[in-house]
């Protein structure tokens, strides 16, 4: 039987081979539920962390299912340039979990969205209600020190993964 999990900052995928599913058809429902619940929890985390500006990050979470003759695959993808920056933080304030430090380091020095950073930050702080006087110092702080992490993806995946073994056991006990 073959079942594999792979995850990084912008994607989690589950692959299972045909023999694994032949054992029990209920597993497909379990994985569907797992991936959808991870997406909903990640969206909820984004909302709770106050990481929502105009909804780009929240709306960038996509679930895909690919099935062919031998393999079934489920993916949850964060299809946003700034997902890693929100998840781990930036510059001095970056603080990834110890288990993800080496992975988070791959994003150091990476450029986010192209264009005028100061203009984007100015627009952001205006939307957040900052005064004209406070916007300049807030921008300088972000450019110098970075932004705090607001983890949303990995906590959602880990939460859902803790519940997955029990769901798999239940599915395997059910009759076809």
Give the positions of each predicted feature:
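Short, Lys/Arg-rich flexible segments
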Residues: 1-176
């Amino acid at each position: 039987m073959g079942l594999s999990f792979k995850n990084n900052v912008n994607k989690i995928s589950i692959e299972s081979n045909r023999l694994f599913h032949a054992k029990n058809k209920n597993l497909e429902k379990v994985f569907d539920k797992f991936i959808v619940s991870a997406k909903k929890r990640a969206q909820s985390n984004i909302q709770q962390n106050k990481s929502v500006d105009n909804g780009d990050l929240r709306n960038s979470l996509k679930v895909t299912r690919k099935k062919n003759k031998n393999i079934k695959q489920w993916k949850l993808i964060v299809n946003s340039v700034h997902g890693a920056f929100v998840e781990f933080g930036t510059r001095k304030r970056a603080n990834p979990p110890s288990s993800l430090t080496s992975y988070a380091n791959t994003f150091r020095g990476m450029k986010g969205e192209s264009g005028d950073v100061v203009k984007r930050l100015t627009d952001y702080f205006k939307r957040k209600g900052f005064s004209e006087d406070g916007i300049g110092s807030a921008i300088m702080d972000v450019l110098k020190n970075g932004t705090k992490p607001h983890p949303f993806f990995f906590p959602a995946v880990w939460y859902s993964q803790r519940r997955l073994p029990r769901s798999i056991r239940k599915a395997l006990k059910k009759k076809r």
